[in-house]
Amino acid sequence: MQSIKKVIGSIDFGILSPQEIRKMSAAEITVPDTYDEDGYPIEGGLMDKRLGVIDPGLRCETCGARAGECPGHFGHVELARPVIHVGFAKTIHRVLESTCRECGRIKLTDEEIEEYFHKFEVTGNRKKAKDRLIKEIHKKAKERMVCPHCGSPQFPIKFERPTVYWELRKDEEGNEYKHRMMPSEVRDRLEKIPDRDLPLIGLDAEKARPEWMVLTVLPVPPVTMRPSITLESGIRAEDDLTHKLVDIIRINNRLKSNIEAGAPQLIIEDLWDLLQYHVTTYINNETSGIPPAKHKSGRPLKTLSQRLKGKEGRFRGNLSGKRVNFSARTVISPDPMISINEVGVPMAIAMELTVPEKVTEFNFEKLRKMVLNGPEKYPGANYVIDPEGRRIRLMENNLETVAEKLDIGWTVERHLLDGDVVLFNRQPSLHRMSIMAHRVRVMPYRTFRLNLSVCPPYNADFDGDEMNLHVPQTEEAQAEAKILMEVQNHIISPRYGGPLIAGIQDHISGGYLLTREGAYFERTEVEQMLMFAGVDVDRLPEPDKVENGVELWSGKTIFSLLLPKDLTIWYRNKLCDEPGRCEALEKLIEEKLIPDEEEVRALAYDGFTYILNGKLLSGAIDKTAYGREDGKLLDIIVREYGVERARQFLDQVTKLAIWVITHKGFTTAIDDEDLPTEALDRIREIIREAEERVNRLIEAYRNGELEPIPGKTLEETLESKIMAALAEARDNAGKVAERYLGMSNHAVIMAKTGARGKILNITQMAAMLGQQSIRGKRLYRGYRERVLTHFKPGDLGARARGFVINSYKSGLTPQEYFFHAMGGREGLVDTAVRTAQSGYMQRRLINALQDLKVEYDGTVRDPTGIIVQFRYGEDGIDPMRSWKGKTIDVNRVVLRTLLKLRGKG
């Protein structure tokens, strides 16, 4: 009969009673030692064979199993005197304050008790409400100085961390004195509390009697939980828990013998406190108020609490996150020639990682050859598994034997092959695209190869980043990874609904060089670039022009070969500096919808992209076409032609752009920042005017003529007006630099097309750095009444407060360099602090939201069925599948319908 599967309904935690500890114990431990001189476990010692065995050749005396099979068994130590369990110290204090010192009843009247029990029934299982009631009961009972049940006087109890309780008593004369409550007295008081009162103090009589919080018996964990290790020198090193238990047993034995010998109370109390210290640090070695237990080397011991807590602890380190097999990690390198959904895997890794493949009649011959190749020859196999589940390791001497035995139904653990599905991940994994499924491409050398377009979701660069690769081991896992996680399914970001996997840097500059006005290519170049990009065409289109008998094709015509044949889209791109020219084209399209190609070419302008039926008629390609976040063209291809077509387009367009940029040349150097004399004169003029403006503002402030901005003081008004004047000066200087450098300048091309950087960066390189700021204000910290000694005290002028008039090209003065370093320092500190804060915030958020899910009715619920949101995200829309927050783009549907109808005539 099959075993009936059961679902866990709930888990209850309780406290172990002394009886339970003794019952589950296999041996009482009395000897504070581990092994004898022969290296054999001592009976009654901490490595007693009844607690399990870890040494090969020995058998467990409790279950009879050998090392590796025996799970280990608990032991126990009978404590000579009770000690407080540090984890319950605060709870004990609360319970002592709430109950009578004589009769043990809770210090509430019978009517109040009845009323609170009724309230508990009403709250049911709502934890927060219950906790509130328990807090209220404690507050009320604590203030009662006479027991309502037996009438005996009560005394306040002071708790001294970590485990000391004082009763503030009064003598006959009314003088207050402190009486220390030893753990035995505490335990006696807790024993008096009747079971019926326990729910009112938040305890359950069956699972957690209060006196169990004071230990009389200490459980000793199994040997398997605290194994010894043998060092290279042959010396045995014990686990931290074993060290601590040795201390506990040694002091416990001393305390026992002193009690039996009738030693003075003072000595007994000292030893008792020492036992309490050892038990406390055994449970938690980070208890505040006492020094941590340390090794001879000074390293604090890792005891029970430290094994569970924190990032390296049992929960986060071994349960939520654990190390896995079938994974690899190495440095990443760029490879523009592989597809976005591929990953280049080094041959060494492909031969080490395996995929289990079942032998069928279809793949029998292929797998047989792999078995014959063995582990040393690629493509081979490392193991085979027979139908009984026996693993056979393939070695040079058994390859032919195993290959002969191989039959349908066996499993071969073969090397990674091209096309296998693997998971690729870069840490920190901040969003779901930090781990995606790629197809294997086995390659030489020792680094993973990654297509450049896939860097943004991983936030990867190639300055030494390492990435992880995981190999799914079952067909189900591979299918799941392929369907849910493959790279092309994540081109659109779920954050903002625009492309995240897109052309970057060189791809965008190259796209511009290919498609800008006046870019023409000869037949040999066209054939080369199409072959390089992997574009399959039956024959080349007609040349755009013939010059001196040479056929020339425009970059726009070549780019059009990559586009779907019925794609129509138009938009203003980043290069649209002359709105009038863009408006002329928009008007033409509005009037005719499908204007004549020649009409469009007559008005064509790099700043306005117009694609009609798969032909690029106007505009250069920049970040607005297939860049990250902005890529309108890529976005349309994903949504209207599917992710596979988008992958093909992205693969081809990036290779094409790389061919153009490498063959036509694209360099940026220091001479890109050279400005003519008249430009430098104009910039100096702008700086002079700005400084004069600032001086006028300071004068107006000192003469009391400055009008304060509403809500700001005079000083704040002055500062904000100075900041505005200096920011305007920097922007004007930037415009001058931009005008003189022009679109023939490669640095400007990068900034204007959105490939890399902004015009501000060029301004700072060529014109001037401008005002340095800390927290949005001018620099003000430094010497008294001035930032640096190079300026007069009280000088509020532009240069004295961090205005840098030089550019990187012209070089900064020492004062300017110092000001610039002040601004830069803030950026570094800010980055470091933000990273830590956002990481911790994300962890808390994940922990809070991890068990919420969207049900089939569209609501978001927690596991108990409580509704968190009636519609996911308040609108129920997935940004990946929506059009700017709408479920459908009506204009686009109308446009496509009209185009189809016009096409049919």
Curated annotation (Swiss-Prot):
Binding site for Mg(2+): D461, D463, D465
Compartments it resides in: Cytoplasm
A GO MF term: DNA binding
GO BP terms, alphabetized: DNA-templated transcription
Main location: cytoplasm
GO cellular component terms listed in the entry, alphabetical order: cytoplasm; DNA-directed RNA polymerase complex
EC number: 2.7.7.6
Cofactor binding description: Binds at least 2 Zn(2+) per subunit.
Binding-site residues for Zn(2+) 1, renumbered to this chain: C60, C63, C70, H73
Known catalytic reactions: RNA(n) + a ribonucleoside 5'-triphosphate = RNA(n+1) + diphosphate
UniProt-listed CDD domains: RNAP_archeal_A (cd02582)
TM stretches of this protein: none
Alphabetized UniProt keyword annotations: Cytoplasm, DNA-binding, DNA-directed RNA polymerase, Magnesium, Metal-binding, Nucleotidyltransferase, Transcription, Transferase, Zinc
Binding site for Zn(2+) 2: C100, C103, C147, C150
Cofactor (UniProt): Mg(2+); Zn(2+)
Top-rank taxon, per record: Archaea
Quaternary assembly: Part of the RNA polymerase complex.
Record function comment: DNA-dependent RNA polymerase (RNAP) catalyzes the transcription of DNA into RNA using the four ribonucleoside triphosphates as substrates. Forms the clamp head domain.
HAMAP family: RNApol_arch_Rpo1N
Family to which this protein belongs: Belongs to the RNA polymerase beta' chain family.
Protein name: DNA-directed RNA polymerase subunit Rpo1N
Source species taxonomy: Archaea, Methanobacteriati, Methanobacteriota, Thermococci, Thermococcales
